Swiss-Prot record:
Organism: Ranoidea aurea (Green and golden bell frog)
Keyword Membrane: yes
UniProt region (Disordered), positions on chain: 27-47
Protein function: Amphipathic alpha-helical antimicrobial peptide with weak to moderate activity against Gram-positive bacteria, and no activity against Gram-negative bacteria. Probably acts by disturbing membrane functions with its amphipathic structure. Strongly inhibits the formation of NO by neuronal nitric oxide synthase (nNOS) at micromolar concentrations. Acts by a non-competitive mechanism, probably by binding to calcium/calmodulin and as a consequence blocking calmodulin attachment to nNOS.
Alphabetical GO biological process terms: defense response to bacterium; innate immune response
GO cellular component: extracellular region; membrane; other organism cell membrane
Tissue specificity of this protein: Expressed by the skin dorsal glands.
Family listed: Belongs to the frog skin active peptide (FSAP) family. Aurein subfamily.
Propeptide boundaries: 23-49, 69-72
InterPro entries per the UniProt record, alphabetical: Frog_antimicrobial_propeptide, FSAP
Record's signal peptide: 1-22
Biased composition (Basic and acidic residues): 38-47
Name of the featured protein: Aurein-2.3
Length: 72
């Protein structure tokens, strides 16, 4: 009976250790994903700003062409 108790405790202990390790890895992966999302959000903002600048220039150029045609 004592042998079964020791075996059972050993199995439970090893199960808890592996569960603890898995939880720790999940937390680390979650933090990494949060950091990646923040970096992607910043890159997306920079891309939007760059695109907005290009659109502004194109609209300005089209507007100036329209003004030139009105003058002629």
């Amino acid at each position: 009976m004592a042998f079964l108790k020791k075996s059972l405790f050993l199995v439970l202990f090893l199960g808890l250790v592996s569960l603890s390790i898995c939880e720790k890895e999940k937390r680390q992966n979650g933090e990494d994903e949060d950091e990646n999302e923040a970096a992607n959000h910043e890159e997306g903002s920079e891309e939007k700003r760059g695109l907005f600048d290009i659109v502004k220039k194109v609209v300005g150029a089209i507007g100036s062409l329209g003004k030139r045609n009105d003058v002629e």
